[in-house]
Amino acid sequence: MGQQTFEFLLLAMSALAVIVFVALYYVRAGYGIFHTPKWGLSVNNKLGWVLMEAPVFLVMLYLWWNSSVRFDAAPFLFFLLFELHYFQRSFIFPFLMKGKSRMPLAIMLMGVVFNVLNGLMQGEWLFYLAPEGLYTDAWLSTPSFWFGIILFFIGMGINLHSDSVIRHLRKPGDTRHYLPQKGMYRYVTSGNYFGELVEWIGFAVLTCSPAAWVFVLWTFANLAPRANSIRNRYREEFGKDAVGKRKE
């Protein structure tokens, strides 16, 4: 991918993120708590998550392996951090899910397209288009790297713990919804989304990559409206007093 193509992709993805942000305040993505048959054909939720998330893991792996900097310390570490998240998201998280919920095929396919494009954005910059000499070993001793990596792992910890809290709300066979109360859910209604946003802000800080900042924009554009919808749903089901002053 050339520099001009890369810059066009960043601009296009940024513009699309703004459109998605607005649209999701009017249209609830029909997966998880908002699953509805109106979205048409659906697939097993576990299979859907694997097929949706695995492409970005594989695209990043391909771009890294074919680059000349693949074993340089900084790019290699960036690669490991990115793949750590997506290995868990693609090949562990889906199989920890409980229940027999479904994922609309349309949402899965849109997720595949986004993840392929995001993998291209991240990998092209980190392994091919970053200015020569930028990501030397000295990068790993910069304040931005250390601040970013701390944020990254704090966010990952919040995300993983919040997912665990959600999974353990129900006993086997129970299909009711419950208001999560532990961990970050004491402060926000979507602790898992908050953790993921912090995680990718950390990645953007530690890499100073323009592609990573576009991904932060996308993460916010996708998750903030959904967090708002979930908060409203909790208020409807459990009452405003139960939800309290938790942020979205």
Features from the language model and the residues they span:
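Active-site pocket-lining segments that scaffold enzyme catalytic pockets across diverse folds
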Residues: F93, A106-W125
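Hydrophobic transmembrane alpha-helices
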Residues: G2-A23, M60-F71, F114, T136-E248
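Short, solvent-exposed loop/turn segments at secondary-structure junctions
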Residues: F57, K100, Q122, N159, ...
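Membrane-helix and juxtamembrane interface regions of eukaryotic multi-pass membrane proteins
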Residues: M1-F87, I92-L109
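Juxtamembrane "helix exit" motif at the C-terminal ends of alpha-helical transmembrane segments
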Residues: Y62-N66, L117-A130
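Juxtamembrane interfacial secondary-structure elements that flank transmembrane helices
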Residues: A23-H35, F87-F91, K100, W125-P131, ...
